[in-house]
């Protein structure tokens, strides 16, 4: 029996791998290089904030900008057919960078002013995953609004893989946005977030079950200005609005709107008793 299996195995694996090969061959493939996009994002962010402190000379700074623009055009050429449109899209993105940088500096200042653990701007720039995710989102959102395929999702999913923060590039997020810790945050495609909003780890701004036919409808909640959402809260639905100046407590589950100046919290009973009231179990095993 062992001899028969040995003889059949190469034929079996050949057929199995061939079927995989054929399915891959039949699938429409994008020519875009995922690693190329990710490397470009890292280079852009380093240049945007001079994280490695290597641009003491303005001419060097300008030259790097031109190089980044050429690299972007090379990336865009994989998903945009028209050469003139590639140049237009690239120019539009770099024309927007000054405004993007201004908005991001406001996000950075918000973290510094609100988070007592943040000791300096450099610490936030180098070590805070929340700010990294916000930066990548604001970059990806420009491409999303230009209707450029694939690239916006590659950017945000790259950051998702590094930080655990999942922000769809199509979401609308206002200024002075603050993410604390960040792990497990999900912000869906049609989410609208106002200014001065603070979100903690594990928060989901998601959709209720929607058919594919209604994919273009607003499926995710609206968070108005000056709202704080604490850890592991879940807010679902395109008709759900959290009013101005509201606070959503940890572990809250919401599928309906909340008026302005609301405090929403999950109420559960916690009892504290003396250990002596509970005899130690003889069969307790870890």
Where are these regions (language model features)?
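Terminal amphipathic alpha-helical/low-complexity segments used for targeting or macromolecular assembly
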Residues: 1-157, 279-286
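Short regulatory "switch" loops immediately downstream of catalytic or recognition motifs
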Residues: 80, 205-211
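Short helix-capping and hinge/turn segments at secondary-structure transitions, especially at repeat
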Residues: 144-148, 160-164, 178
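Short acidic loop-to-helix transition motifs that present clustered carboxylates
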Residues: 160, 172, 212
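Left-handed beta-helix
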Residues: 163, 168-169, 174-175, 180-189, ...
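Extended hydrophobic/aromatic segments used for targeting, binding, or gating
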Residues: 212-218
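C-terminal functional extensions of proteins
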Residues: 255-258, 276-277, 284-286
């Amino acid at each position: 029996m062992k001899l028969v299996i040995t003889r059949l195995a190469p034929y079996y694996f050949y057929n199995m791998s061939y079927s995989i090969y054929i399915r891959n061959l039949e699938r429409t493939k994008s020519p875009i290089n995922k690693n190329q996009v990710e490397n470009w994002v890292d280079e852009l962010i380093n240049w945007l904030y001079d994280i490695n402190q290597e641009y003491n000379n303005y001419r060097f700074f300008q030259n790097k900008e031109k190089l980044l623009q050429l690299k972007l055009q090379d990336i865009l050429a994989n998903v945009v057919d028209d050469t003139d449109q590639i140049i237009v899209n690239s120019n539009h993105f770099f024309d927007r960078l000054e405004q993007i940088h201004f908005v991001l500096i406001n996000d950075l200042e918000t973290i510094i002013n609100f988070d007592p653990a943040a000791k300096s701007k450099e610490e936030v720039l180098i070590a805070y995953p929340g700010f990294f995710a916000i930066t990548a989102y604001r970059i990806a959102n420009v491409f999303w609004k230009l209707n450029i395929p694939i690239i916006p999702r590659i950017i945000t999913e790259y950051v998702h893989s590094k930080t655990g923060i999942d922000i769809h590039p199509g979401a609308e997020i206002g200024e002075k946005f603050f993410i604390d810790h960040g792990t497990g945050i999900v912000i869906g495609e049609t989410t609208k977030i106002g200014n001065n909003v603070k979100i903690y780890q594990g928060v989901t701004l998601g959709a209720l079950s929607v058919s594919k036919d209604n994919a273009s409808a607003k499926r995710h909640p609206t968070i108005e200005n000056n709202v704080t959402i604490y850890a592991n809260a879940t807010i679902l639905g395109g008709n759900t609005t959290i009013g101005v100046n509201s606070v959503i407590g940890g572990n809250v589950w919401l599928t309906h709107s909340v008026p302005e100046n609301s405090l929403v919290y999950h109420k559960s009973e916690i009892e504290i008793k003396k250990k002596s009231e509970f005899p130690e179990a003889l069969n307790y095993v870890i």
